Amino acid sequence: LIVTNFSHGHHGDATDADNPRVRWRYDPAMAGVSGQFADCGIHALHMASFISGDEVRSLSADFASTIPGRALEDDAMVNFRTERGTVGRLWSSSVAIGRQHGFDIQVFGETGGMRWASEQPNQVYYTPVGGRTQIMEKGDGSLSDEATRLSRVAIAHPEGFPLAVANIYVDLAAAIRGAPAGALPTAEDGVRSMAAVYAAVESAVQDGVWVDARPPMFR
């Protein structure tokens, strides 16, 4: 079972609806077919695939526009299934007042569960079945070689979003040089994400009917 969300409340003020920095996100002429799900929710869905190593096969979506005048959704609930049959739940909202960033993920399996939140990015919480919760810290020497490679500063020091993005550019430069590129996002990731956005829109307009979320070439 995978539960993930990317929800904040920064667009929840109806009196700010005409702010150009907000308005374009819900205007199909500028944002396309989807609002909040394409803006934030798709990141949570991709994270679910990245962490589990399993691609999304199908989904069922429920979109809502809670602020009058918005043509695109500002809240999205999505159920999904992966290629290996894992059950997934996703919530993405821009009107969840009180939430600042709200990007997190939980994975529950046969032997335990884990959770990570972007607002506490240095820790992963892991609980084995029948055991105590363990906190794995960024920079800890017991982590994998890949985790160590991606840690830029010493343990207990905040890494920050810019350095996380910098890791992607480092891997991109390695790929250009022909060296091993780590877990670099690929064109396939982008194609799958776009297909999932269109599938979610298709599902939402049909009251949540289940839709194949895979691009045609991967079906």
Regions picked out by a protein language model, each given a short descriptive name:
Residues D54-E55, R70-L72, T86, R99-F103:
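Glycine/proline-rich active-site loop of Rossmann-fold NAD(P)-dependent oxidoreductases
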